From Swiss-Prot:
Its main location: plastid. InterPro entries: Ribosomal_uS2 (IPR001865), Ribosomal_uS2_bac/mit/plastid (IPR005706), Ribosomal_uS2_CS (IPR018130), Ribosomal_uS2_flav_dom_sf (IPR023591). GO terms for biological process: translation. GO terms for molecular function: structural constituent of ribosome. It is found in: Plastid, Chloroplast. GO terms for cellular component: chloroplast; mitochondrial small ribosomal subunit. It holds the Pfam family Ribosomal_S2. HAMAP family: Ribosomal_uS2_B (MF_00291_B). This is Small ribosomal subunit protein uS2c. Coiled coil: none annotated. It comes from Lolium perenne.
Length: 236
């Protein structure tokens, strides 16, 4: 894996609050190597470790993107939904930002069928086919289309399983991580002080509750993906 410089600096991470963990009573002992101190009843994350693993994650996604690999970003926390969508669109990644349905990856054949139905419905609406149907049927189809857009809109162009999955909240997206582990899909996950760093291939110790922290980490990863995509396009 190529090692590159990703302009990750401690001052920027401190300003974003990346170092703030959970209260000392809400911690996972496996996170001990990533904690540098306790302050006013709160664990403080060791940002040198954050920088190291974030850099490794950026190297991984850059190399994968430069080979034309596909990515899925998962973040269903309400406050992060818009951030997840905009970051994924910017980096041409698939994303899930509303709800993770159990079996979304492990029951891929079912997910693929739903995506096919979604694409067909969108095409029919665009071609004006709904205009020739009774109003009641149109209302039913539009409700179905709206639901599919809400929950599957971020993966509507996904035709196969992703090569790498990025998870923004380990505890909230635990099922997604388990599905990736079952399928052998490499994962990158933010891990706060109450998380298990062993659940992902690359765990980035960071505050996963504050938007500024999530945004900083995600932006670094997205920048690396975009750089990798650019290299792939130049070489092909």
């Amino acid at each position: 894996m190529t090692r590159r410089y990703w302009n990750i600096n401690l001052k920027e991470m401190v300003e974003a609050g990346v170092h703030f963990g959970h209260g000392i009573k809400k911690w996972n002992p496996k996170m001990a190597p990533y904690i540098s101190a306790k302050r006013k009843g709160t664990h403080i994350i060791n940002l040198a470790r954050t920088a190291r693993f974030l850099s490794e994650a950026c190297d991984l996604v850059f190399d994968a993107a430069s080979q034309g690999k596909s990515f899925l970003i998962v973040g269903t926390k309400k406050r992060a939904t818009d951030l997840v969508a905009s970051a994924a669109i910017r980096a041409r990644c698939h994303y899930v930002n509303k709800k993770w349905f159990s079996g979304m990856l492990t029951n891929w054949s079912i997910t693929k069928t739903r995506l096919s139905q979604f694409r067909d419905l969108r095409a029919e609406e665009k071609m004006g086919k709904f205009q020739h149907l009774p109003k009641r049927d149109v209302a039913i189809l539009k409700r179905k289309l709206s639901t599919l857009q809400r929950y599957l809109g971020g993966i509507k162009y996904m035709t196969r399983l992703p090569d790498i999955v990025i998870v923004l909240d380990q505890q909230k997206e635990y099922i997604a991580l388990r599905e990736c582990a079952i399928l052998g899909i490499p994962t990158i996950s933010l891990v706060d002080t109450n998380c298990d760093p062993d659940l992902a291939n690359i765990s980035i110790p960071a505050n996963d509750d504050t938007m500024t922290s999530i945004r900083l980490i995600l932006n670094k990863l997205v920048f690396a993906i975009c750089e990798g995509h650019s290299l792939y396009i130049r070489n092909h």
